[in-house]
Structure formats: structure tokens, C-alpha cells
Amino acid sequence: EKKLSYPVELKIGTYTVVCEVTNKETGYFNLTEFSLKVTSAFSEGFYILKETTDGNTDMDFYNDRQKTVIPDVIASVQGEAQSGKPCNMCPVYNKIYIDPATAKSTYATGVFVTSGQNEFSIYSTIDMSTLFDRSSLLFSEMDGEEVPYAMVSAMRGNMLFSNKGVRLDDLGGGSFASEYSTGKLGYPAGKGTSSFIQAYDGQNLSFWSGETRRLMYTSGSDMEEIKYKDGYEGVKVDWEQAAPVASGWNHRAGKNTIWYLFDVAGEGRYVVVLQPGGGIDQVIRLDASLHLAKADVIAGNALT
């Protein structure tokens, strides 16, 4: 009987470990396997975006396994909170970056946080170090007029949405990723976007464009308007007067429902329902007495 000890130097994730034991005299052997889950202090739980008492941005982390809370994770690691009031937070999967310890390309799950007028950082869920910010995500420092809204992971890669358009980056470990990838982003495609982003189909994401004032979809390399489905004769939205309020994606009984909520000046609120990959399927003008027609904080239930 031996006590085995083996150092684990693996990325966060779930692995299958196979052990083989061989009898030196007979040559008989036996195999056994087990699952190994590699985690970090910041990889299993929930991030809570918050405004600090002095008006800046930080996050608390709730560890779901240990039922504990780590407060102020940005300030505790970075030495100070992120400047400006919090705006948005997104998970970014398989984000490529250069590991400063090895100077080689690698990848990790990140948390994209925007604050103030145009500040953002991508923090590693391994140790909350900064993977990228305004000074490092592009091949040159980001233009002062660019406003990043969100970074979203999709089938083709990670997409940065800003008022300049969409920038696409390969997923680390994916079939298109190169061992020489740096994670930096090139020129944007299309026109200005917003923070209202949802799925659309297996390849594309839908979003509200603040520049074209239309619902659009993108694969990261181009943009197209989402039009009413063929033969649509229902209620329509005056896009020029519409202001986005919320968006969501619901999955129920095997059906995906993607929706956007708009406030139209002088008319009230409308719910726009998309048919995945097929255009605008339905528009519902809300009764002014409904809570949804007046609420300030709205969230969608992703899975019922």
C-alpha cells in the first residue's frame, strides 16, 4: 500500500485521471479512473457587481461550495477598486492572453467589467489578475472616444461590443486558435452597438444598435438587420423613437424565446420576440397598468 502524491498543474476544468497498476512478477495489470476537478478561489460561485461607498466599482464573490463570501475582490487583489460607477459585467470564456510567467499564449475564463464613462478590465478567474484593459486589449491604446459595452462568448469566439462596432477574437483551445495568439483585438466590424445583447441562432448574436437604431445580428465579422419575419402583419415598433430597457433569453419546454423590451416615447413599452434565426416573430404592446410596463429593474429567467 502506497500513498501517492502527484503535483497538479492544470488549467481550471474537469479531467479524467486513469491509474494503471502492474504486477512486476506476473505482468497482470489493472486500471481505475476517477474525475479530477481543478478549481481556484474565484472559479466556483457567483460574482456580484457593486458600487463602493465612494462611487467606484468592485465585486463580491460567493463561493457556492463553501457557502462563503469574499468581499471586494478587485480592491483586495488590485489594491484599489475599478474607477467609476459600475455599468456591466460579463463572463468571458477561454480568453486568450500571454502568460507573463512563461511568455507563452494561454487562456482562462475572465470577468469583463465596465465602469464610469468608458473604463473596463478583464479579470482572470484564476487569481483576479488583470488580463486586459484599455491600454492592452488592442494593438494600440484604445481611442478615448470608444465606449466598450460588453464582451460575449459565442461559437466563433469572444466578441467585444462597443460604440465602434464588434471585434472578434478566437476561443483559446479552439480549432482556429494559434499557439502565437496574443488575445489582442483588431479593427471593429459594422457600426455602433449597445449593452443589450442576446443569442440569435447557433452562429450569431442579436443586439440593439444605438447607431442604426435597429435590432441587428452578427457573427463577429459582419452585421445584418433583424427584420420582421415574412408575412408579418402584427404590431410594429417605431424604431426611431424606441429606447431599449431590457433583454432576455428564456428556455421552456424545449423552446428558446429571445426578447427585447423597448420604451417608445409617447406610446409606452413594447416586448419584441425574436424567432431564433428567423426574424421578429411577435410584438406586444404592454398595458400601461402592468408591472412590466413600469418597472425600473427587469431580468429574464433563462431556464424555467
Q: Over which residues does each language-model region extend?
A:
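Preference for solvent-exposed, low-hydrophobicity sequence contexts
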Residues: 68-69, 73-77, 96-304
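Low-complexity, repetitive regions of proteins mediating host interaction that are extracellular
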Residues: 1, 64-65, 146
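Surface-exposed assembly/interface segments
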Residues: 83-96
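Short, flexible N-terminal segments of the mature chain
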Residues: 60-86
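An edge-strand/N-cap motif at the start of beta-rich repeat modules
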Residues: 35-65
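Beta-strand-enriched, solvent-exposed domains that form extended recognition/catalytic surfaces
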Residues: 1-42
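Residue-level signal for short segments within beta-strands and strand-turn junctions
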Residues: 23, 61-63, 275, 287
